[in-house]
Amino acid sequence: MSNNEFHQRRLSATPRGVGVMCNFFAQSAENATLKDVEGNEYIDFAAGIAVLNTGHRHPDLVAAVEQQLQQFTHTAYQIVPYESYVTLAEKINALAPVSGQAKTAFFTTGAEAVENAVKIARAHTGRPGVIAFSGGFHGRTYMTMALTGKVAPYKIGFGPFPGSVYHVPYPSDLHGISTQDSLDAIERLFKSDIEAKQVAAIIFEPVQGEGGFNVAPKELVAAIRRLCDEHGIVMIADEVQSGFARTGKLFAMDHYADKPDLMTMAKSLAGGMPLSGVVGNANIMDAPAPGGLGGTYAGNPLAVAAAHAVLNIIDKESLCERANQLGQRLKNTLIDAKESVPAIAAVRGLGSMIAVEFNDPQTGEPSAAIAQKIQQRALAQGLLLLTCGAYGNVIRFLYPLTIPDAQFDAAMKILQDALSD
């Protein structure tokens, strides 16, 4: 059956709200290669939206899941616990850059992790308010949509959203927003909208995902830490997209001296299996009463087995170092292209969490059309890319960190051609 035939069936069987970017259907995948039902091959620089830092079907991950399949697939951890969940929590506790002794709870999706981080913060503080940042993305459930600082397509037609959520600008040199602007906005909130003693948490992405890979300045993170300490507010770092070697360190927060109280994780944690988590200061994590946290599939044993494999792969294959090496090669390609492509307004990121932003060279305004044109040129040559950003004018790069050098070089050639056409 052809891609077009599957496409027509999709239109009849599934709602339009589940938007689909590609007009081809996956048949198989290995490492950084995706093959469709017609046999066409693509270099996958989307990785299921940052889920496959260790690549499609890494042999070690497949073996770990297959071994777990032979034992049991589900008990519901809250009913009958299992050792692998506890061991994974111990590993994350030892690795995560959070304040004080750590504890970890596992869930299923990134949005679920963020929801539970807010629950934990509210239980710990007894306060309702949460401050988030414009351009941030935290999920598609109602609380996480409220936290998300981007309207289209996530929020259209779904309001009203949960209250006691406030947004402030995220720093951006390109768009003229300084760290001080962000901090001044928080202080204005304290004066005009909610007193500091009613704020449970400040949540931020150290590198914004959907927002366009904007990197939090170290001065911002330090100032948030000071504000949280001063007012008894829980500091939450959302690492759903940035975690597990993508930025050149295991977590993006490893780039900063200041540590959050809670940290959310998902996506590449389990290499394609549905698993998320919240790790944080043990005293704060213990705030909810027994039964207050959990979920039927939370910490599913197959996904937990995959996560153990992911941590081993990252260590064994030195993927943090690999992320820095590949990211520098990508940055060099984009910076070189900038000399002859006036639409390139900025190249930014950490490690292999790199993005390029496009503006109209005539007006200087953000141009989603240029980003989409380059994305389509690349796709026509077999390179799968994703756009993002508040204006849809950013291309982000989320290749598996396990991609072979020759394939990465081929992708860079396609990218150069797409930028120069």
Swiss-Prot record:
Catalytic activity field: 4-aminobutanoate + 2-oxoglutarate = succinate semialdehyde + L-glutamate
Annotated Gene Ontology cellular component terms: cytosol
Keywords (A to Z) from UniProt: Aminotransferase, Pyridoxal phosphate, Transferase
Keyword check for Nucleotide-binding: no
Modified residues (N6-(pyridoxal phosphate)lysine): 267
Cofactor or coenzyme needed: pyridoxal 5'-phosphate
CDD domains listed in its UniProt record: OAT_like
GO biological process, one term: putrescine catabolic process
Phenotype on disruption: Cells show only 35% of the wild-type activity.
Pfam families attached to this UniProt entry: Aminotran_3 (PF00202)
UniProt activity-regulation remark: Completely inhibited by succinate and low-aeration conditions.
Keyword Transcription regulation: no
Identification of the protein by name: 4-aminobutyrate aminotransferase PuuE
Gene expressing this chain: puuE
